[in-house]
Amino acid sequence: IKKDMPTVSHEIGQWCVYPDFKEIQKYTGVLKAKNFEIFQETLAEKHLSDLADEFLYASGRLQTLCYKADIEAALRTPGFAGLQLLDLHDFPGKGTALVGDLKPFWESKGYVEGEEYSMFCNQTVPLARLPKMVYLNNESMKAPLEFAHFGAEPLKSASIYWKLADKKGTILQSGSWTKDLPVTNSIWIGNMVCDLSSVQTPQELILTAGIEGTKVHNEWHIWVYPAEEKKITNAPYMTNVFDQQAIDRLEKGENVLLCVSRGALRPEKGGNIKVGFSSIFWNTAWTNKQAPHTLGIYCNPSHPALSLFPTEKYSDYQWWDIVSDCEAIVMDDFPAEYRPVVHLIDDWFTNRKLGLLFEAKVGKGKLMVCGADLLKPENGRMARRQFKQSILNYMTSDRFAPTTTLSVEEI
């Protein structure tokens, strides 16, 4: 590449989303969505049809997060001339490449709209260089703010603002600058700094930056957890092995937390499933099962096991520490109506019922099983520590009351 030749990224992203089976009825001509019909049938065989739209939405939110990360990385790169997506809609061929934010018919899939997308993919984009997305409340957030501006002409004396607020809209800190924005990227604005000591409970915060009097703005979500780890009294028995000691404790009516070690599952029980934070690239049929094999998590955010781990029903960055180092547990042999606390959304070619976290009554006791090994050293993974804290808080409360009974053999 010549020194003065513009460099543009080619077909970045290609992050997949779960199929939207409502599209099937739109194929009224010579082309039929037989692939979707097969995927729909295999989902029904696993008794998960009622979750099809939930899987679409949850995986779609992760897809949007992945595209946002890729696009912002390109816009932050000094001297970079631009980026190209394959398309905004799905590519139905080559193994079924569900990489679009839109249906093949240029219609919304319901999980992201143009207004949100334009925050990070536009001619003028605020860009935060966040060093991390998870903080403790004895830290300060410090994030440099830059702009990429590729409008028709420079912006003179732009009134730039930023704020960090909680989900209720209460502003923790804010700031402003007046800056000229030339036609380029890597335009330095200033540092966004906020002491986080006022955040006394686990919270999701929203960092926003933009230009006053315009639609130009962008936002990022961060998570803040207490630095002091709460002591758990009457903690359950915790183990990596479902051995006779664990069984005996359950038979006596105790609570047990079973954390699956990496590589501990047989292939048919999930050992051959590669879990990652991102969505599937292109599709596994075309890439010969290139990892990852999953499409993020799906959960009920109001489940009491997650009360100290703020989340939506889909993956966001607080899940990175957990799903990037976990096993997917195949639960196809469990009762048809059984649902885990936290699902891992499987590849649509296999449509297995996958669990990351699930609970059951076993013997006289109660069991919680986690596909992430929460017993090994944290090594700075504060989100994983908080996830464990939330689970233990739940298991030591009277809210821990699984409704499904499983036998030792089923476990």
Positions of predicted regions on the chain:
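Substrate-binding clefts and catalytic carboxylate motifs of secreted carbohydrate-active enzymes
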Residues: 1-164, 340
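Catalytic beta-strand/loop cores that center a nucleophilic Ser/Cys/Thr
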Residues: 1-3, 262-267, 283-382, 399-411
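Beta-strand-rich binding/interaction modules
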Residues: 138-180, 189-193, 202-212
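Short alpha-beta junction capping motif
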Residues: 234-283, 364, 370, 391
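Beta-strand-rich interaction surfaces with strong enrichment in secreted/lumenal proteins
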Residues: 131-133, 176-182, 195-197
